[in-house]
């Protein structure tokens, strides 16, 4: 399949293959997981790669602070993906992609202009931010109070959002329905994973869909893949990752109550796609803290850089109006399902075994059941005779 796609002229790579019907709306969602490699291979990789690994998704520094800090986006994409051999000898990253067909309506206006109450519940927001990992300057959980049940019940939720009980929180208006998904997983870097993702998308006719979205977090390698292989798809930054940065910046250097009130204003702007208002408020707050990228100002500086870098992927009101997904919870759920198979305190893989199992797990989690097709075709190829190797005289 990959060879067939790569052999096509560029003009034909977005056409529908023969016998395939293009869906109405699709999304490609990309993320990364973790697994452990056997020590001898990990040490060999550490000797071969003497480059530092950022580990977390790249977060650019505000333009005004570039003189005092290294710009994250200046680093090469392949260096972004180098393994953390200097810090964690065993852990390595794998790439996961979900190609989903979706169903939703196109609306004349934003079907959900008001911020859902789930994002106004302090303990829920704290849990979301903790899971993403951006909590610099945020007070301990004990200083937050849960939203009363009668208030929480008015909100809405998405797949993967923190403890939002189904009985309490209804689905967000306009949220797309997932019809089917195809899963890909590999230990290969984005330079190899990107073409594979595009080839499978082509084979399913996704490039010919009327509405197409590419959803991911802020990792630079995700957007390198999007720009190179899915340039005509609408790029959407995962809302939860953006929320975590805004939450940390709002509370940095403030008392909990004051910071929470600021967060509610800022996250409302973000939800409504009013990114320039949010960016102006962040820059003002950063200046109040004296600028720079150290101390209390660090969380604000990081958020300013993050919003500056991804502001073209944050028009959430327009995305909801088009019925597109605004969160990467579908692929994050798949990453966890893959992790249930490959991660564990006593699970250490060789590179070949890890690659094979990642691909098998991805096929198992795909709705089109490629494993069933494989076994059926394999049975048809069997002759009942055992192949014999010729003996060398």
Predicted regions and their residues:
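Catalytic center-proximal scaffold of phosphoryl-transfer enzymes
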Residues: 1-393
């Amino acid at each position: 399949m990959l060879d067939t796609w790569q052999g096509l002229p560029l003009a034909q790579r977005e056409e529908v293959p023969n016998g395939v019907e293009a869906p109405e709306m699709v999304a490609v969602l990309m993320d990364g997981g973790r697994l452990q490699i056997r020590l001898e291979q990990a040490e060999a990789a550490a000797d071969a790669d003497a480059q530092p690994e950022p580990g977390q998704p790249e977060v650019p520094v505000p333009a005004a602070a570039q003189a005092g800090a290294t710009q994250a986006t200046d680093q090469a994409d392949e260096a972004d993906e180098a393994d953390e051999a200097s810090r964690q000898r065993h852990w390595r990253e794998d790439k996961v992609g979900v190609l989903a067909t979706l169903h939703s309506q196109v609306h004349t206006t934003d079907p959900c202009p008001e911020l859902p109450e789930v994002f106004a519940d302090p303990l829920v927001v704290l849990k979301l931010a903790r899971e993403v990992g951006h909590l610099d300057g945020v007070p301990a959980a004990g200083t937050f109070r849960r939203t009363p049940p009668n208030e929480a019940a008015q909100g809405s939720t998405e797949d993967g959002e923190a403890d939002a009980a189904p009985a309490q929180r209804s689905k967000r208006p306009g949220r797309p329905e997932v019809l089917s998904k195809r899963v890909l997983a590999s230990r290969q870097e984005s330079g190899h994973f990107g073409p594979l993702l595009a080839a499978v998308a082509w084979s399913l006719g996704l490039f010919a869909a009327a509405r197409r979205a590419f959803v991911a977090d802020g990792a630079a390698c995700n957007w390198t893949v999007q720009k190179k292989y899915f340039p005509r798809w609408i790029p959407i930054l995962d809302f939860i990752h953006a929320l975590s940065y805004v939450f940390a910046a709002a509370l940095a250097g403030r008392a909990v109550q004051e910071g929470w009130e600021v967060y509610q204003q800022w996250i409302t702007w973000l939800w409504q796609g009013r990114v320039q208002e949010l960016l102006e408020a962040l820059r003002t707050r950063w200046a109040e803290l004296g600028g720079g990228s150290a101390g209390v100002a660090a969380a604000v500086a990081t958020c300013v850089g993050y919003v500056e870098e991804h502001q073209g992927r944050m028009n959430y009101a327009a995305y909801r109006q088009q019925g597109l997904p605004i969160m990467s919870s579908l692929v994050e759920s798949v990453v966890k399902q893959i992790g249930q198979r490959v991660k564990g305190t006593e699970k250490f893989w060789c590179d070949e075994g890890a690659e094979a199992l990642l691909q098998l797990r991805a096929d198992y989690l795909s709705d089109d059941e490629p494993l069933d097709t494989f076994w059926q075709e394999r049975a048809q190829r069997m002759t009942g005779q055992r192949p014999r190797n010729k003996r060398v005289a």
